[in-house]
From Swiss-Prot:
Pfam families: TPMT. One of its GO terms (cellular component) is cytoplasm. GO terms for biological process: methylation; response to metal ion. Its EC number is 2.1.1.67. InterPro entries: SAM-dependent_MTases_sf (IPR029063), Thiopur_S-MeTfrase_Se/Te_detox (IPR022474), Thiopurine_S-MeTrfase (IPR025835), TPMT (IPR008854). Signal peptide: none annotated. This is Thiopurine S-methyltransferase. The keyword Lipid metabolism does not apply. It comes from Shewanella baltica (strain OS195). It is found in: Cytoplasm. S-adenosyl-L-methionine binds at residues 10, 45, 66, 123. Keywords: Cytoplasm, Methyltransferase, S-adenosyl-L-methionine, Transferase. The keyword S-adenosyl-L-methionine applies. Belongs to the class I-like SAM-binding methyltransferase superfamily. TPMT family. The gene is tpm.
Length: 218
């Protein structure tokens, strides 16, 4: 999946993947990570997610990475926060006192940016990649996270043949097979969310499960 795909989605505002509300799993399970308020939290492929506001409200320092410039600008505009913009290598750095967003390719994000991170949150990143690219992203995420980092991973699973992604289906089996080398994995929850997703109902997708995992970088 080329960068142009995502740039076009944002340009056309075809952003059905963007949630208007804070993710319920984040609200319910984030406290299980037991993090101090001043923790640095990495949010890959963050878009303009309001989940970052929730994390900031917990006292955390939020570090996001997002490919599309418009997404980053809309985030700060939507929440009415003034930010400062600088250039860091190949990335544009937009930041306030608590939120730092690096606009650019996650595969070229300098590791120095995340060297003090001790937590991460992935709701829309892993499921954004088709299977042929997903393992590469998972390895990049692991490489950016210091050992001992803990995180909340949220996935969707459904019969992939019933609907072309994104979001793409990520099964519990895929999570175990591709993440267990780098992370300790615990399942927090898995529930049917088909009734809350009209797009999937319209396409006659027979079932849709959302799962939450607690991960710890080895």
């Amino acid at each position: 999946m080329e960068p142009g795909f995502w740039h076009e989605k944002w340009h056309q505002q075809q952003i059905g993947f963007h949630q208007q509300d804070i993710n319920p799993f984040l609200v319910k399970y984030w406290q299980k990570l037991g993090l101090p308020a001043d923790t640095q939290v990495f949010v890959p492929l963050c878009g303009k997610s309001l989940d970052m506001c929730f994390l900031a409200e917990q006292g955390h320092q939020v570090i996001g990475c997002e490919l599309n410039e418009l997404a980053v600008q809309q985030f700060f505009s939507d929440i009415q926060l003034e930010m400062t913009q600088t250039t860091v290598g190949e990335h544009q750095h937009y930041h306030t006192e608590q939120i730092s967003l690096y606009q650019g390719d996650i595969f070229t994000l300098p590791k120095a940016i995340t060297q003090e991170v001790t937590a991460f949150y992935d709701r829309a990143a892993l499921i954004a990649w088709p299977e042929c690219m997903r393992a590469q992203y998972a390895k990049q995420l692991a490489s950016l996270l210091p050992s001992g980092s803990v995180g909340l991973l949220v996935t969707l699973d459904y019969p992939q043949e019933a609907l072309s992604g994104p979001p793409f289906a990520v099964s519990p089996t895929w999570v175990e097979q591709h993440l267990s080398d780098d992370f300790d994995i615990g399942v927090l929850a898995s529930q049917d969310v088909l009734a809350d997703n009209p797009r999937f109902i319209k396409k006659a997708v027979p079932w849709l499960n959302e799962a939450a995992y607690l991960l710890k970088r080895k």
